[in-house]
Design a protein with these regions (language model features):
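N-terminal accessory beta-strand-rich subdomains and adjacent acidic, glycine-rich linkers
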Residues: 1-138
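Bulky hydrophobic/aromatic packing residues
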Residues: 96, 100, 109-111, 142, ...
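An acidic-aromatic substrate-binding cleft motif
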Residues: 105-185, 189
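Substrate-binding cleft of carbohydrate-active enzyme catalytic domains
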Residues: 151-250
Length: 250
């Protein structure tokens, strides 16, 4: 489900971070007052897995699902936003909604609704329907800068560690342990999530005083581990070229 307090309307639930833990529940017991976001996986008989999701989603609101009782699901889409306002340091929130869901040009393609069926969980992982249905990238696209890999990540794993021989939290030392772990296990990257830059002003050039970023970059380079810096749209859009060039030089 969307991570929200009970009692929130659908319009209030449209503003969310799309972060939550999975909930295993019978379709008939889904909370009709809450929205579920995609992908949704259904356990059918004899180990069969059914996944519901979308592909090629551009200029159109993503689909939520809402339980209707029994085995019925209803699709719900956010209306077209009218105006945006800041809501906290990182978030822009819709001020109001129109009575339609999208503005489209003549001939615009709409997203695919995908229902994938697999014999088991392994086959589900191998399914490439979303990729097959997506618009191919331009054949002249330069992909040389894309370097895929696994990451060691602190956001979901929690910073507040106990029983360790270093100061836990968002500071230089724990990130060195993450780098050591990544190097030891063939993990290509670590992610430094929210907190490496000072949050109060959403300024990417105000580094958390407990973090020595240049030291960490040098340390990671020595172990052949890359560092990915998380940044909010609100903070990076102020001067993207300056931010990118500044951190690319490290």
């Amino acid at each position: 489900y969307v991570k929200s307090d009970d009692g929130k309307t659908f319009k209030q639930q449209f503003v969310n971070s799309f972060e939550n833990t999975y909930e295993h529940i019978h379709l008939s017991r889904m909370n009709p007052a809450k929205l579920a976001f995609l992908p949704m996986t259904v356990d059918a008989a004899d180990g069969v897995k059914i996944v519901i999701t979308e592909s090629d989603l551009f200029g159109y609101p993503g689909m939520f699902l809402n339980g209707q009782g029994g085995k019925e699901l209803k699709s719900v889409r956010a209306p077209y936003p009218i105006g945006l306002r800041p809501n906290g340091v990182y978030v822009y929130q819709d001020m109001d909604y129109a009575d339609y869901i999208a503005k489209v040009e003549a001939g615009q393609k709409f997203p695919w609704k995908v229902i994938g069926i697999a014999q088991d969980a392994k086959s589900l992982m191998e399914m490439d329907l979303v990729w097959q249905l997506a618009t191919p990238a331009d054949e002249n696209t330069d992909w040389s800068w894309v370097k895929p890999g696994k990451v060691a990540w602190d956001w979901w794993n929690d910073w507040n560690l106990y029983g360790v021989d270093f100061r836990a939290g968002i500071n230089t030392e724990p990130y060195k342990y993450y780098i050591d772990f990544a190097a030891a296990h063939g993990i290509e990257y670590i992610i430094m999530d929210e907190g490496w830059a000072q949050r109060a002003k959403a300024n990417l050039f105000l580094i958390n005083p407990d973090i020595n970023l240049e030291e960490l970059v040098s340390y990671a380079n020595g172990k052949n581990v890359g560092i990915i810096l998380w940044a909010s749209y609100n903070s990076i859009v102020k001067n993207p070229e300056k931010a990118m060039s500044h951190y690319a030089k490290m």
